[in-house]
Amino acid sequence: LKLAKNVIFTGMITPEEVGRYYQAGDLFVSASTSETQGMTYAEALAGGIPLLCRRDGCLEQVVTDGENGWQYDEKEDYLMRIQEWKGMGENARSRMQNKAAISAEKFSSGNFAERVEKIYEQQIRKYRYENAA
């Protein structure tokens, strides 16, 4: 793929610098076989960076293939998606970047708080129903 001239291994960077590094990229690529929190995916999306990552059940609600990125299963899928990205016109890339940024909104602290609040409300209702006299 001749990507070596376009890939930079930075080593450790401070948390304050993270956003600048995401903005320097065009596509977030991950070959991770397991994720515990998936913060890197949310951070990349928040910066409008589409994702290319190994298929993982925890990412089903994160990556919408062809919209805000892709998931791949095998090396061939990965290579195909890289070629697809490289061949995309500026308008198509821009649309995908916009969709990436929009999809990150579900990871905002406000949305997280709303989801947690709903869970608590459901559990309170369930408790009251089960313990009604």
PLM region spans:
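Nucleotide-activated donor-binding/catalytic signature segment of Leloir-type glycosyltransferases, i.e.
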Residues: 1-12
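Short alpha-helical segment that forms part of, or immediately flanks, the ligand-binding pocket
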Residues: 19, 37, 42-46, 60-61
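Aromatic "clamp/platform" in nucleotide-sugar-dependent glycosyltransferases that forms part
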Residues: 33
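Short hydrophobic beta-strand element within catalytic cores of glycosyltransferases
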Residues: 50-53
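Conserved acidic donor-binding segment of nucleotide-sugar-dependent glycosyltransferases
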Residues: 65-66, 70-76, 84-90
